[in-house]
């Protein structure tokens, strides 16, 4: 069974309590359960990981690139959190690993503060899902399934 890696970046471990007016009341555990259900529906294995550390996320993207190249993985769904707006290193990792990646944001970043309007990740992503809440994870998983 092929796999999809779901990566959540900094502060997403606080889902459910951090700014619920922006992100809703679903916890990270709720999101991971939703992703597992979506994976089962599409016949793919889902692996969920979260880190507040840029280097860890980069290492996981490199690992995913090797898994994709070996034919074991379909790609990555990633909510890069605030690294969206700051991390050229994540952009370079995605490009360098040649990993199909769907960038995902729970909130509509374009309707928020000006600094959130630019993404370093988007030019390296296969697609982007923004502002659809946690249901965006389900759509992102479906987008990677052939």
Curated annotation (Swiss-Prot):
GO biological process: amino acid biosynthetic process; aromatic amino acid family biosynthetic process; chorismate biosynthetic process; quinate catabolic process
Enzyme nomenclature, EC number: 4.2.1.10
Hydrolase as UniProt keyword: no
Site (Transition state stabilizer): 18
Keyword Amino-acid biosynthesis: yes
Taxonomic superkingdom: Bacteria
Subunit comment: Homododecamer.
GO MF term set: 3-dehydroquinate dehydratase activity
Record-linked CDD domains: DHQase_II
Homology family: Belongs to the type-II 3-dehydroquinase family.
Binding site for substrate: 79, 85, 92, 106-107, 116
The protein, known as: 3-dehydroquinate dehydratase
Keywords recorded for this protein, A-Z: Amino-acid biosynthesis, Aromatic amino acid biosynthesis, Lyase
Enzyme class: lyase
Reactions catalysed: 3-dehydroquinate = 3-dehydroshikimate + H2O
UniProt pathway: Metabolic intermediate biosynthesis; chorismate biosynthesis; chorismate from D-erythrose 4-phosphate and phosphoenolpyruvate: step 3/7
Source organism per UniProt: Variovorax paradoxus (strain S110)
């Amino acid at each position: 069974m092929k796999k999809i890696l779901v990566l959540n970046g900094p502060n997403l471990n606080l889902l459910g309590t951090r700014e619920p007016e922006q992100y809703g009341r679903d916890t990270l555990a709720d999101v991971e359960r939703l992703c597992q259900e979506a994976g089962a529906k599409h016949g793919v294995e889902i692996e969920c990981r979260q880190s507040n550390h840029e280097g860890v996320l980069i290492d996981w993207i490199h690992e995913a690139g090797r898994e994709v190249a070996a034919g074991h993985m379909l790609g990555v769904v990633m909510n890069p959190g605030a690294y969206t707006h700051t991390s050229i290193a994540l952009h370079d990792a995605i490009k360098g690993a040649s990993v199909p990646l769907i960038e995902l944001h729970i909130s509509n970043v374009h309707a928020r503060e000006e600094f959130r309007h630019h993404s370093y990740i988007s030019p390296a992503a296969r697609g982007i899902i923004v502002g659809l809440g946690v249901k965006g994870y389900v759509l992102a998983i479906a987008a990677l399934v052939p």
